[in-house]
Amino acid sequence: MTENIKLHTDQRVTTMTIARPEKRNAITQDMYAAMADALEDYAQSDAVRAFVITGAEDYFTSGNDLQDFAKGTRSDGVPPVIRFLNAISTCPKPLIAAVNGPAIGVGVTMLLHCDLIIAADTATFSTPFVQLGLVPEAASSLLLPATVGMAVANDMLLANRVLDAAEALRF
């Protein structure tokens, strides 16, 4: 487990905190491996009834650490990001997101796979994939329109419209 992913269990609820505040909680491949392990364990555990995902300090997550991803992926099996996305999208138990600040890119994608999203007033939601020359991952181009409607999803995905917590509450 990387020191940037913190797990705490209390009264059958595990909280996973993305804890890399010096990089606005940008996620590395090692962090994805730790998050995949945690979700896979949760899916199999009878001791835990709910799983909360949150970010440390002022950010939920600023998305992928692009410098880390530019180094390439490991060659041993399924890449950690794919393991994580598979684990979050197929988890048979309740997933709760506690969004304490900006959720960017894959941070929004994560939310689309959660059963409940609780957002602080400081939360914002943005998907700068096109501006970065990337494609939305893990069915976010399907799930975002289903959640916020086609017009808002297109505005978010194609023009990087940022939703604040008050606006997101409408959806």
Predicted regions located by residue number:
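Phosphate-coordinating loops and pocket residues in cytosolic domains that bind phosphorylated ligands
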Residues: A26-Q29, S62, K71, Q131, ...
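Conserved CoA-thioester-binding segment of acyl-CoA-metabolizing enzymes
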Residues: M1-A56, N86
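Hydrophobic alpha-helical membrane-association signature
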Residues: M31-A34, P80, M110
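Glycine- (often His-adjacent) and acidic-residue-rich active-site loop
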Residues: E40, A47, G55-T90, A103, ...
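Terminal peptide-recognition signature
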Residues: M16, R20, M35, I53, ...
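Crotonase-fold acyl-CoA enzyme core
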Residues: S89-F171
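Structured helix-beta-strand junction loops
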Residues: D10, S45, A56, G72, ...
